[in-house]
């Protein structure tokens, strides 16, 4: 299972800001957007293309377009916070949704919503900011496969080794793109050092 941890200094600098507990929700959103833009570049650099022609004001020129439609699939709710750059940068992108709610006592997520288009001959791109135990991502990837998705890609901001291993065992074909591979999980199955609850910090709902 390919795992790509970004080594770009701008990603590392933005990640420092995300980790800082004094970062405001407004600042957090800006930093997350920067990181996702870089990770999206890395996750799409090898997309299949098709060659054609385009008419410029002066003459015809060779042109390249993306061969297969990309379907962005954010995991609710935190995945919504990293959807923006994907919609702006990818041509002809469609969006599916998977709603997963984590039980803080068991760290197991339940599916409460799903709306996926047909994924045959498309490129599934799973958006889930934190890859902790891997349970939620594995469930989401199960649904993606059931909808016909093959060779999915996943963008997360921070990953834990436990989550990577879980996906490697259950979905070895998935390609993971992340800003950081952290030390591991604590007793509550939160990533450490991590950056806290991504959704709460993004949407300003920390208690």
Outline where the language-model segments fall.
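PRPP-associated nucleotide enzymes
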Residues: 1-207
């Amino acid at each position: 299972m390919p795992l790509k941890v970004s080594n770009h200094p701008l990603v590392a600098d933005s990640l420092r800001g995300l980790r800082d507990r004094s970062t405001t929700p407004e600042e957090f959103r800006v930093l997350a957007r920067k990181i996702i833009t870089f990770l999206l570049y890395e996750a799409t650099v090898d997309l299949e293309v098709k060659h054609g022609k385009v008419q410029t004001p002066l003459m015809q020129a060779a042109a390249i377009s993306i061969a297969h439609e990309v379907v962005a699939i954010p995991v609710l709710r935190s995945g919504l916070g990293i959807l923006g750059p994907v919609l702006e940068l990818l041509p002809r992108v469609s969006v599916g949704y998977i709603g997963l709610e984590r039980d803080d006592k068991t760290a197991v997520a339940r599916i409460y919503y799903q709306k996926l288009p047909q994924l045959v001959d498309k490129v599934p791109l799973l958006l889930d900011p934190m890859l902790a135990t891997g349970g939620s991502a594995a469930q989401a990837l199960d649904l993606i496969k059931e909808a016909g998705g093959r060779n999915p890609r996943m963008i997360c901001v921070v990953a834990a080794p436990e989550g990577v291993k879980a996906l490697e065992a259950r979905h070895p074909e998935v390609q993971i793109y992340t800003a950081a591979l952290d030390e591991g999980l604590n007793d509550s199955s939160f990533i450490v050092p991590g950056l806290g609850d991504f959704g709460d910090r993004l949407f300003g709902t920390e208690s």
